Design a protein with these regions (language model features):
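Nucleic-acid enzyme cleavage-core boundary/entry regions
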Residues: 82-136
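Conserved aromatic-histidine-acidic binding/catalytic patches
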Residues: 1, 39, 109, 113
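Activity-critical C-terminal alpha-helical subdomain
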Residues: 2-93
Length: 136
C-alpha cells in the first residue's frame, strides 16, 4: 500500500495488484514488483535472497550458513554489514572460478535461472516486454 500511496501522491497511476501494471490507458504505465516474490519461504527482501534460493548447488548452503553464524559475533572478526550480500559473496567464493558480483555469478550459471522461484519475475518481465512492443 505504501508504494501505491507514493505513486498516487506523485500523480502516477498504480497497479491494483503487486507484480502487475496500472491500467490507466494514459501515456504513463507503472509496474510494481516486490522482491523476492514467491514462495514465501524465501527469507529477506533483497535480490540476493531470491538468488540464494536458486543456487546451482543447494548442498553448499548449510555450510555457508554455518560459516556466517560462526564468524558473526566473534570479537576477532568484524560482523558483516549486510548479511545478505555477505552470504552471496561466500556462496560465489565456493566456486572454482570465483566471481566477485552477483551479476558475474549469474553469467557463470551459478544460479538456476529456470527455477520456479523466478516464475513471477519472469512473468513480470514478459508483461514489460509486451507493454513495450504494444507501445511501438
Amino acid at each position: 500500500d505504501s508504494v501505491r500511496h507514493i505513486l498516487h501522491k506523485n500523480g502516477l497511476p498504480s497497479p491494483n495488484n503487486m507484480n502487475d501494471f496500472s491500467e490507466s490507458g494514459g501515456s504513463v504505465t507503472t509496474g510494481v514488483y516486490i522482491l523476492p516474490g514467491k514462495p514465501e519461504d524465501i527469507t529477506g527482501n533483497m535480490l540476493e535472497d531470491l538468488c540464494l534460493s536458486i543456487p546451482d548447488n543447494p548442498l553448499i548452503m548449510p555450510y555457508i550458513d554455518n560459516y556466517l553464524s560462526l564468524i558473526t559475533g566473534d570479537p576477532n572478526v568484524v560482523d558483516p554489514k549486510n548479511i545478505h550480500k555477505s552470504k552471496v559473496l561466500v556462496f560465489l567464493a565456493s566456486h572454482k572460478d570465483v566471481p566477485n558480483t552477483l551479476g558475474l555469478g549469474t553469467q557463470k550459471n551459478y544460479f538456476d535461472l529456470n527455477h520456479a522461484n523466478l516464475d513471477l519475475l519472469v512473468e513480470f518481465f514478459a508483461k514489460v516486454k509486451t507493454l513495450l512492443e504494444d507501445g511501438d
